[in-house]
């Protein structure tokens, strides 16, 4: 054994504990603090459910963060065991040690560590603790200090459980929600469930679940299928959204009260950085949405929105869309003679745009050729998608020759040239032999341009 290698000694100690579970369970209260983090990681990776359950009870730090740990479906039982054993009430035995763990964060985040560094032992702090909810540790302790000043009353010890939720109606989701509600009941009000990322499939079936969540915490909200009226009711309980994604939303009219209420809620979202409106009919009304958005918008997705020439003209002049990093305008027909508004938009975004998608937009040869000068000015572009547009091989080759000058551009999703189809874009009419020749030609062109780092791919439907 190398006595000069502390990491190796630590690993050996952890493996020794895991190989003798019964002894490890008895020794947890006595092992050094420095051993807890590697023991927790190894126990989770190895599926040691009983040890994880006990680790949560005696965790010697203020917070426990899943951080970079990868959670697969078989490990959901480990998560449930940790939640079940998360100490949310003071110990019944006065001789028992008060648990130190106050914040259990089950979200996956590769940028954070297993626990936050201890800046102050007297005033422990977690960088990821809830800041918006009235039920957060910070707000409750502030209130307790005010109410109990000069009083000897012992107040409940607030704790937080941070989760991302996907409400899809599955059995696993229902079991997880029952577990959370039982834990809230067990805590007698001291547990705050803090959900930051909320994804909902079929909003109409999730109203009861949404009632027990504090939606002030949510900063990422996604709905796949729902009425705008129901969505507006949910948005009224949110205040700090950074990302809003709505797919296949139904509403009666762009001039009705519901749409106006929706715009009113968007106006309040001062922190919004990402907006995704997919299959959201906006023809000739894009200006009404964009005008109420904050100027800090980074990501804008508008596929299947039936955008008009008027909408594109406004988009090119809109300050809210002048600093975008990502723009997705796929499945909006662009068959106009005048492409100047779109060229102007790309010019405005030349300093920031990293990801552009204009797939299925009916962009032909002349339009694509007119876009090349604007595209090559987007020097930060990393991903470009313009698949399923009626482009000929000469124009596709011209696009490739032009784009190879963009050193940051690594991924291009290109359209299959029209000569590869008996009838363009009809299912079953693709000549795969012709496509194979196109792919060989493009590969050779990349090699000549010394851009083997670029990945040109296409879809064969």
Where are these regions (language model features)?
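N-terminal alpha-helical scaffolding segments that mark the starts
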Residues: 1-40, 44
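C-terminal capping region of solenoid repeat domains
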Residues: 2, 76, 85-89, 119-130, ...
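Short, solvent-exposed loop/turn at the beta-strand->alpha-helix junction
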Residues: 19-23, 33, 48, 111-114, ...
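Conserved hydrophobic position(s) of the canonical leucine-rich repeat
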Residues: 23, 101, 218, 241-244, ...
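Death-fold interaction domains
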Residues: 42, 47-141
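Alpha-solenoid helical-repeat scaffolds
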Residues: 95-301
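A structural signal for leucine-rich repeat
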Residues: 119, 210-214, 232-240, 255-270, ...
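Structural position within Leucine-Rich Repeats
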Residues: 197, 220-225, 248, 274-279, ...
